[in-house]
Amino acid sequence: FEDTAANVMAYINKWIAKKTKATRNAMILKVADEMTKGKEVVISTIDSLKDVFNVGLDPAITTGAMVIANQNGYHSLDKLKDKEGKYILQPNPTQPTQMMLFGKYPIAKVSNRTVKSEPVYSPAFTISGSKLAIDGTTTAIDASATSDVTAWKVVKGKYVVTCKGQEQETTVDAKVSAYKHPVYMGDLKEAITLFDRNVITIDMNDKAAGLWEKDMTGIKVRDRFDVQPVDDGAIIKGNITEVVQG
């Protein structure tokens, strides 16, 4: 068992490297979301993609442009075909494992856990007697007309409704009617700067917080970096809406 500790440390170092990379990517996309908030475009056809690359992005940007999508968004793009029946995502001739959009723009697929699709809710409000009903389920909320509802939101899977100026919780399950899959298009190197000190410190301790008594060792990792927006014209965020069936 002499190499057991070394094997464990090798595994931990590999795990830390993987997590720090994921953290950087998540922060970069968080900044991208902030830069594009309220300016998202709808991606529903091949033409809508061409609108982004032909008109939405400056020609100087498209030369270094790429596409980033989560698994759901990638899957939606991967099913699109042109008028000749060819898929718009094709392997890079020089790197067969890399896919290209329109044969020009590399596309990167990231995990749905890292970049989540946004759920869309479309509650139907009706009046049942003197009570408000949501999606056919009668609530305890007094209402005489659907116009009494001025706002709603979803909290922990349930609808919270503002009716007659009062915010009230309900027991009605919020049903997802669709998902918006995010697609980032442009040159991230021009849009965002990663200030990376390339310094990761790892501290190990087996005596803190009762670790000694439990025969455990604690690990603390410090990673110093920052992400800042540079050019909001270098990136466009699109949403692919997928309707939930049933």
Give the predicted meaning of each segment.
Residues 145-146:
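Short acidic/polar hinge/loop motifs at secondary-structure boundaries
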Residues 37-134, 140, 150-225, 245:
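Extended oligomerization regions of viral-like shell subunits
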Residues 1-40, 211-246:
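Flexible, glycine/threonine- and acidic-rich loop/arm segments that mediate assembly and lattice contacts
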